[in-house]
Amino acid sequence: VILKMGPHKKNQCDYFIEIFDSHCNETDNHTLLQEIIENRKTFISNQLGESNIGNLADLFSTQAAKDIIGKQASPTLPKHYFLIEQVALRLFGCLLSCWTELEIFRTIKNSTLTIIQNADNAHHTYNSPVINEHFHYEIVADIALDTRLFHTEFCDQPLRLSDAIVLINIATFIKEHQWYEMLGMLNISSKGEHFILYQFNDKSAYPNIISSALINSAPTSRNWLFFDDFFQSSKWQPIHQSYSILNLECATKISTTLGKSQLMNKSSDDIEKSIFSSILDHKKVCEAIRLTVSGSKSKANFYLYLAQKGLANALKESGRDVVFTIIEKPAMVLFYQSMNIDTPEASPYLFTSAQDINKNGVVTYKGIWLLKNATLAFNQYNFKEYNVKIIGLRKLLRNH
């Protein structure tokens, strides 16, 4: 049945995904494709040796992967798995791309079924603060419990909030940036505390999600991405920023137990853990990750500005003072660097470490958002003035 394809490539792909998902449901094996990928991952990794193992995208792009996948059946998997692998490879060019499309299909399908089943109990009230006249922002305590519907640019129909955020994360982080590791952890995107920024239009009763971010509270800090082993290795170069302690004390309105000796000549790991442990009231601390911005490319920079402004205000209104976060978008980095140069004693962002992870010139930064200063900055500078700060520093850096 799997080999009976329609005349067009897209139709073939859609048809394959649909009947494959049906097969998984009938056999009660929803991780079949994941089993194939994990099996291939292990085999290829053993072929290459540990020193050559990158992320999934790198691993499945190697010559070793090309020589094996779709060409040599795995001796440890059922025979029909190899047929599935061959068809998936022919249609999608990569097993990881096929897995991505499968999760998109499942997200939309499951959301549609849930909406139909709970139509009588749906709660569609959208009351939240507004920024720049037309954009609403809020923090949702647990998106898994939210029954409201939202549009995304990745689906024609409205979806439940949790499914909309999962779909946005798949499209943004996995399809665009090839962070395929996230496919096995999509449940993280479907629950818990989240920030959302959205906008209504005249064409639908449901708003469009412009931005979202996952918020992790201090009690879960052991599981924060910020403190994950990958982000605490010696590859991260520490950044020593002037006035760090003064900024932290002013931002938290209380004294910390931090001393200068804990920051000087220390590794980024030591610096970041010292800062976290020094903050006396952990209810005022959180991590914000997976910041997404959706919409047309022409408005991408404006939406990124609004997302930061909305997130800073929302977190401050929720009682937070300090936010641990990881950023790499050049516009964000340049704006914070510019503000730190202009107002070093009122820094909106304390940079703690940096690394060019993919060796492509795009540096990823770790640091701490100080909400008192960040909200002042974003409420002081409109989008045009925000851009002037970014462009000005970019020109300055080019000339040096």
Name each region found by the language model.
Residues 217-219, 295, 371-375:
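Non-catalytic surface loops within mature trypsin-like serine protease
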Residues 1, 87, 130, 140, ...:
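Extended aliphatic helical segments
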